[in-house]
Amino acid sequence: MAKKSKIAKEMKREKLVNQYYELRKELKAKGDYEALRKLPRDSSPTRLTRRCKVTGRPRGVLRKFEMSRIAFREHAHKGQIPGVKKSSW
């Protein structure tokens, strides 16, 4: 489990990215890099890290399910993820 402060910081960044999305898009289209530079650093989508919604783990996150590989495996074995079943061949 990740530290609560790290998860909170990531949520704050996500909020800022969503807040400044349209403005950043307009400024980039105009080519106004001076105004872009004055925006908060955390408003850049590059600074976001995909984290597991269950554990907050930053690595090994499956995009489709927004879960880490470990949490995905646990939930899949319990049958808590619809449409997912263990394959065998």
UniProtKB/Swiss-Prot annotation:
Complexes and interactors: Part of the 30S ribosomal subunit. Contacts proteins S3 and S10.
Coiled-coil boundaries? none
Molecular functions per Gene Ontology:
rRNA binding; structural constituent of ribosome
Q: What is this protein called?
A: Small ribosomal subunit protein uS14A
What is the role of this chain?
Binds 16S rRNA, required for the assembly of 30S particles and may also be responsible for determining the conformation of the 16S rRNA at the A site.
Establish whether keyword rRNA-binding is in the entry: yes
Q: List GO BP terms, alphabetically.
A: translation
According to the UniProt record, one GO cellular component term is: small ribosomal subunit
Q: Which Gene3D superfamilies match?
A: 30s Ribosomal Protein S14, Chain N
Family membership = Belongs to the universal ribosomal protein uS14 family.
Instruction: Enumerate the UniProt keywords alphabetically.
Output: Ribonucleoprotein, Ribosomal protein, RNA-binding, rRNA-binding
Give the matching InterPro entries: Ribosomal_uS14, Ribosomal_uS14_bac/plastid, Ribosomal_uS14_CS, Ribosomal_uS14_sf
Per its UniProt record, what Pfam families does this chain match?
Answer: Ribosomal_S14
Question: Domain of life of the organism in this record?
Answer: Bacteria
